[in-house]
Design a protein with these regions (language model features):
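Central cavity-lining transmembrane alpha-helices of secondary-active solute carriers
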Residues: 80-98, 180, 328-341
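Hydrophobic core of transmembrane alpha-helices in multi-pass small-molecule transporters
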Residues: 50, 119, 130-147
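Helix-to-loop junctions at the C-terminal end of transmembrane segments
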Residues: 92-105, 190, 336-352
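Symmetry-related core transmembrane helices of the 12-TM Major Facilitator Superfamily/SLC fold
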Residues: 11-21, 207-230
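Short amphipathic helix-loop junctions that connect adjacent transmembrane helices
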Residues: 59-77, 303-324
């Protein structure tokens, strides 16, 4: 049987990748020029989160596979477990959101990153259900709840009113680069050691491929701590370009742990009070109706992180590059096409954009 040579296509592929690399450098350079008035902390926090999102991306694509292959959960049980975990950190975000103001950006980043490193250690070390639940998934949920709101606050403090959108766009770009790197690493390790192979780790012994992938996510979590460590805390960039040093908040207890617990307690109480007040306004229920309509679309997007790895392996076979198909392709499209789509649709209403985007996602 003869095969048609596709070697002729390689030069075109190289040109496309070369052009994409140049375009990416151009985008980041434009961000740098636009944010030249911002303190160096905006780059430190963004770079630290690139490593965090790389590790998080690797972890997300591995968890359901690992829960079934190593921990012993069925497909349905693994899916239900991940759904419950997602719900838990979503609720926790409500309580810890105000910690940034009470504790400070740097301290919250340190706490969240330490919890992420701690949890990922137990995710690859143990396969016992209760150990990975209590020492792995619980602190990981708290870590996500800590890190999610702090980024928004940090970017707001490190940019001026006229550059805040640019700051968020830069972070969104770097975040997707992190996700893409995670997909590449996920596939690369599986290609080397096999879908269900074993890897010998010095001092730790032999582990499965999926546990080794989680071990890699654990190691990638460390570099971000360096950039967080050299950040200045309690700084705020004013619109006139002056960098203000914010006064430290008065502690609510004798030590930081007591202070954090009291702040979380107050946060949940305040959130409940705000919800009661907002629920009396008709606009709130219109907004909730919009969210309910879009819930299915968003659910499919998040569901892909946990369902597609198993689906891809079963349909395409062991070793299929499922990380490249979804973990890389999706963020790369976002990085390169969001600026273009934003420019082409700059005169469209938000409602029109949401409607068309949801229809495309649902299709």
């Amino acid at each position: 049987m003869s095969y048609v040579s596709l070697s002729w296509i390689y030069p075109f592929v190289y040109v496309v990748f070369g052009a994409a690399a140049v375009y990416l450098i151009y985008i980041i350079t434009k961000y740098g020029v636009g944010l030249k008035a911002s303190p160096r902390e905006i780059w430190f926090v963004s770079i630290s989160q690139v490593t965090e999102f790389t590790a998080y991306s690797i972890m997300l694509m591995t968890l359901t596979l690992w829960l079934s292959s190593d921990v012993g959960l069925s497909d349905v049980a693994a899916g239900n477990y991940m759904g419950t975990w997602n719900l838990s950190y979503t609720i926790l975000i409500i309580g810890v959101g105000s910690l940034v103001d009470a504790v400070g950006v740097k301290k919250v980043l340190v706490i969240g990153t330490i919890l992420a490193i701690f949890s990922r250690f137990f995710l690859f070390v143990s396969t016992d259900f209760w150990v990975v639940t209590i020492l792995g998934f619980v602190p990981q949920a708290v870590s996500v709840a800590f890190l999610s709101p702090v980024i928004s606050v940090a970017l707001k403090r490190y940019t001026k009113s006229d550059t805040s959108a640019l700051g968020f766009a830069m972070f969104y770009t770097l975040m997707n680069i992190g996700f893409a790197l995670g997909g590449l690493i996920f596939d690369w390790i599986r290609q080397i050691y096999g879908e269900y192979g074993n890897v010998m780790i010095p001092l730790l012994g032999e582990v499965s491929t999926y546990r080794f992938i989680l071990f890699t996510a654990f190691l990638i979590s460390f570099p971000g701590m360096f950039f967080i460590a050299i950040m200045r805390d309690n700084i705020d960039l004013k619109d006139d370009g002056v960098l203000e040093i914010l006064p430290k908040k008065e502690k609510k207890g004798g030590n930081m742990v007591v202070s954090i617990m009291k702040t979380i307690e107050e946060s949940f109480a305040n959130a409940a009070k705000i919800f009661v007040d907002v629920a009396k306004q008709p606009a709130f229920w219109k907004f909730m109706a919009l969210l309910a309509i879009l819930l299915g679309v968003n659910y499919v997007f998040y569901h892909f992180h946990y369902t597609f790895p198993k689906y891809g392996i079963r349909v395409l076979g062991e070793g299929a590059k499922i990380g490249n198909i979804y973990g890389v392709l999706n963020p790369v499209i976002i990085v390169f096409f969001v600026p273009l789509i934003a420019w082409l649709t700059r005169k469209w209403s938000s409602y029109k954009m949401i409607t068309i985007g949801s229809m495309i996602s649902a299709a």
